Design a protein with these regions (language model features):
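N-terminal-proximal low-complexity accessory segments that begin disordered
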Residues: 2-68
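Long, well-structured alpha-helical subdomains associated
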Residues: 19, 48, 437-440, 444-451, ...
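Active-site recognition of the HExxH zinc-binding catalytic motif
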Residues: 27, 213, 385-408, 425, ...
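Amphipathic heptad-repeat coiled-coil/leucine-zipper-like oligomerization helices
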Residues: 54-163, 167, 519-571, 580
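Contiguous, non-catalytic segments that form substrate-binding/exosite surfaces or channel walls
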Residues: 88-176, 182-385
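Short, glycine/acidic-rich hinge or "gate" loops at secondary-structure transitions
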Residues: 214-221, 235, 406-412, 466-486, ...
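Post-HEXXH active-site segment of zinc metalloproteases
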Residues: 400-449
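Extended, compositionally biased alpha-helical segments that mediate assembly or anchoring
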Residues: 540-669
Length: 669
């Protein structure tokens, strides 16, 4: 095990998210709306501390109390007097900044614990004594009660020798009911994260007064009801109003959204974002939406496996003002509720100011590429990623149909006519009743879907019309295609950092997906992709990847076409057995065959670069206007942003966090 895997290096990249100009252009009403939504998001984001690990909330409170008493600069003088070197003190600041940026002491991207150096992982979506089989039992119970797992946690208790399962719903209100299911007792309780949910509801109500239209008002009203009573149905209703709110200047979404970090793949991590539309960049995405129906017909599955109607979504480029949670993505396709996405629509967003800094690369830190590829990679990485994100979100996550039989027995497809292209026979399986993609495919659902969306991006970026939409033609267009595919191949190799050999588990959905794609392209053969182990200039193990750009449109396209069709067919037909066999097969990391991936993993760990952290601005009301408070791009700046973020009720908030953490402690001991 490589020790550095569990530390954040002192030279980690820390960048401020620039939203000054976007915020300046907002009207006074829009600024107030953005401010109160940001406050709701930041308080809700503290839930992630309690979702991440038993100790995260306690460490957060400790750091808040330290830095409220003394600024990072003042504390440095104290540290020097007790013998800490400047590098040691910086390491402390980086650790503190890392805890704030990840909302816990596990990396949000990869779920590796960082300092203290303990390799064994934990999750707080389930109490420490819950097994995977019990998670499956709980899912069956939730399905029977038509409850979604998104905003729940599961706790196993022993009451006088009798096993009892407590399902906690995140809400401001408390109480619910007791049920018997499969000879086991289940207690459903409201009130998880109660004081934090109260804060979220308070600020959402404040934001309502500054809503631009009725859709926004009704959306916030439903969100408040959801967070008050733990109702996923209310959150779904709010999401419907959110979809109808076309082209807002201030865009936001909040709730228990992504299930990447739940070991069972059903429970959502809290996140909330507030962002401002970048009109110039959004024009390109609008053109992509206009071409979507034509492009969807080019995807490699039969028409019956595509949605009956493509509901044209909003697709905008946003500059993030606030993103509260454990990490900031480059793009989002939401809501995640399949029933809404299939019949009512969704929205896509690309986070422009995140892209601008997250993927800036220094040549000397570019690993595993040939020297002649590095300058081209640096030049076209940004534009190629913009194309990939657009296709991934809109036509990746936005494509494909799920075959469903509802509670009344009605099917959304003709089971007597639809042929499975993989078997040549009639479709023989589908989703029934309350079954969803997440509940059915559970542990592989997130990564499998990310892989499908990434493959759509690779496949459709070969289309010249797509490239023209992004202003790319001729040699520039070909270079962007090459770098997009090369970037995916490299990302597949880098993904090995997020594989744990001891448990044979992947810790990050996107990186597992990219490794799977690397395996598919290597398997295609014919010299399309090369991967070899070499010795670096420093005399240490290294690796080099190559991609034959002359074979992307032939060998590469055919390989992705076949694989993508299989992914979609297994997903559409709820064929968990077939889908898992396919995906687990390509996800396996071994030391035999043409490539020793276990040894390559050690090389990747040796040469890995830490993921960047972001410093976000705060907003504060001064009289009748809202001010933007910005911070420097450093660990100290990131720390200051958090200590100033919760100044007004710091003592009560910290007491609430400690009480919530204490309440859960018996479940982990």
């Amino acid at each position: 095990m490589v020790d550095s895997q569990y530390y954040l290096p002192n030279d980690i990249g820390i960048s401020a998210l620039d939203c000054r100009e976007a915020f300046r252009l907002l009207s006074p009403q829009e600024k107030m709306y953005a401010h109160y939504l940001s406050r709701a998001s930041w308080y809700g984001g503290l839930v992630v501390l309690l979702q991440t690990s038993p100790e995260s909330a306690n460490i957060f409170v400790l750091l808040q109390r330290i830095f409220r008493k003394e600024t990072p600069e003042e504390l440095e003088k104290v540290a020097a007097t007790v013998g800490l070197s400047s590098e040691e003190y910086k390491a402390f600041l980086v650790y503190a900044a890392g805890l704030y940026a990840n909302m816990g002491n596990y990396k949000s991207f990869g779920d590796t614990k960082f300092v203290p150096n303990l390799p064994k992982g934990i999750t707080t979506y389930f109490s420490g004594n819950c097994t995977l089989e019990e998670a499956e039992l709980a899912q069956r119970f939730l399905d029977s009660k038509k409850l979604s797992a998104y905003n729940t946690r599961l706790f196993k208790r022993n009451d006088g020798g009798k096993v009892c399962y407590e399902v906690r719903l995140a809400s401001a209100e408390t109480s619910c009911g007791t049920f018997t299911f499969e000879d086991k007792e289940f207690i459903v309780k409201r009130g998880d994260y109660c004081p934090l949910m109260e804060k979220v509801c308070f600020y959402l109500q404040q934001a309502e007064a500054y809503a631009a239209n009725e859709n926004q008002q009704k959306m916030l009203e439903q969100y408040r009801h959801s967070f008050n009573f733990g109702s996923v149905e209310s959150h779904k209703e709010g999401s419907r109003f959110w979809i109808k709110d076309k082209g807002p200047i201030v865009e936001s979404y909040i709730g228990f959204i992504e299930s990447y970090r739940d070991p069972f793949g059903s429970r959502g991590e809290f996140e909330g974002f507030v962002a401002v539309v970048n009109k110039a960049m959004s024009e390109r995405f609008t053109k992509l939406v206009s071409s979507a129906e034509v492009l969807l017909s080019e995807l490699p599955w039969p028409q019956e496996f595509e949605k009956d109607t493509f509901l044209k979504p909003d697709f905008t480029s946003l500059d993030v003002l606030t993103f509260a949670g454990s990490g900031i993505p480059a793009g989002i396709n939401i809501p995640n509720y399949d029933d809404i996405r299939q019949s009512e629509g969704f929205k896509n967003v690309s986070l422009g100011n995140v892209l601008a800094v997250a993927y800036a690369t220094q040549k000397e830190k570019l690993t595993f590429l040939k020297e002649e590829d590095k300058d081209l990679f640096i030049k076209w990485k940004g534009p190629s990623f913009e194309v990939q994100v657009g296709l991934h979100e809109l036509l990746g996550h936005g494509s494909g149909k799920l075959f469903v039989q509802d509670h009344k027995g009605k099917l959304n497809f003709n089971k007597d006519k639809v042929i499975n292209p993989e078997t040549g026979e009639l479709v023989s399986s589908w989703y029934q009743g309350s079954e969803t993609w997440d509940s059915k495919f559970s542990t592989i659902a997130s990564s499998y879907e990310e892989c499908r969306a990434e493959c759509v991006g690779l496949y459709l970026c070969l289309n010249k019309e797509v490239l023209r939409i992004f202003g790319l033609e001729g040699q520039d267009a070909e270079d962007v295609v090459y770098i997009n595919w090369l970037s995916m191949v490299r990302a597949g190799l880098l993904g090995l950092e997020f594989y744990t050999p001891e448990s044979k588990n992947w810790r990050q959905a996107h990186m597992q997906a990219r490794f799977v794609i690397l395996r598919v392209l290597l398997e295609a053969g014919e010299g399309l992709v090369g991967l070899k182990e070499v010795v670096g200039h420093d005399g240490k193990p290294d690796a080099q990847i190559t991609l034959d750009r002359t074979k992307i449109h032939t060998v590469g396209k055919h390989a992705i076409q076949r694989f993508l069709c299989k992914l979609q067919v297994f997903k559409s037909t709820a064929d968990v057995e077939g889908g898992r066999a396919l995906y687990d097969g390509y996800s396996s990391v071994g030391d035999s065959g043409a490539n020793n991936f276990l040894r390559l993993r050690e090389t990747v760990l040796l040469r890995k670069e830490a993921r960047k952290m972001f410093v976000q601005a705060n907003t504060k009301v001064n009289g009748d206007h809202v001010e933007l408070v910005e911070y420097e791009s450093s660990a100290a700046g990131l720390i200051r942003s958090f200590t100033e973020r919760f100044q007004e009720d710091a003592d009560q908030l910290e007491a609430d966090l400690l009480e919530l953490s204490k309440k859960d402690t018996p479940c982990w001991c």
